[in-house]
């Protein structure tokens, strides 16, 4: 099944055949006809299409897509350019500036990170308009857990950045000692002062990659 268009299709072929995934596809196809669902249908698997399995150096986990009009663009924490920056993304940029002295961007599109090898993966891949977490029990987490497990199997070292309790739950899936796990509180305004600010995830990521002779990430938002 060619859903993504790169090596992820072969890696996830077994998941595509499972009943839970077939049920998601059936539900989603109907739901998009009946009511506003985000992200755009052709962007549901965009994080995977932009960052091939073999190119994944870093994984940043999000929850579910933004639920406002025109916001979600298939990448965790990212919004389309021209959309007001969500508070969590503003705080990510503040920490990036503090950590690597990268200027705070006015652009919200993180496609440039995805092309650098950062998989910006939401654990739930769709949401109803103005109803956060409305698709939480649809089965998406079975699929995204499988993605995390497949990355865990990689021989090449990978950095997993887990922000907030929902992301830290996934730590149990990351068992390969070659990988680095960076944890902190979520960049949301409600929790950013409880460990996110000052956690220096970006410099720690690049230090680890460099130590393993892997090209560092350019976190500049272009």
Model-derived features with residue positions:
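Short, conserved glycine- and acidic-residue-centered signature motifs
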Residues: 198
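A polyanion-binding, active-site-adjacent surface
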Residues: 2, 6, 14-162, 166-169, ...
């Amino acid at each position: 099944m060619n859903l993504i268009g790169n090596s992820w299709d072969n890696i996830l072929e077994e998941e595509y055949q499972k009943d839970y995934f077939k049920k998601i596809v059936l539900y989603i196809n109907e739901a998009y006809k009946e009511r506003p669902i985000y992200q755009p249908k052709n962007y549901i698997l965009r994080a995977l299409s932009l960052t091939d399995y073999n190119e994944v150096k870093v994984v940043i986990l999000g929850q579910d897509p933004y639920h406002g009009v025109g916001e979600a663009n298939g990448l965790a924490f990212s919004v389309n350019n021209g959309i007001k920056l969500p508070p969590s993304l503003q705080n990510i940029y503040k920490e990036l500036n503090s950590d690597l002295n990268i200027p705070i961007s006015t652009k919200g599109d993180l496609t440039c990170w995805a092309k650098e090898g950062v998989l910006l993966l939401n654990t739930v891949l769709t949401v109803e308009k103005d109803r956060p977490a409305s698709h939480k029990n649809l089965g998406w987490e079975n699929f995204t857990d499988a993605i995390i497990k497949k990355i865990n199997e990689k021989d090449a070292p990978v950095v997993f950045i887990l922000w907030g309790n929902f992301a830290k739950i996934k730590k149990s899936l990351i068992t390969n000692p070659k990988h680095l796990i960076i944890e902190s509180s979520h960049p949301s305004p409600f929790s950013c002062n409880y460990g996110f600010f000052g956690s220096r995830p970006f410099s720690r990521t690049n230090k680890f990659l460099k130590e393993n002779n892997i090209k560092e990430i350019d976190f500049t938002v272009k």
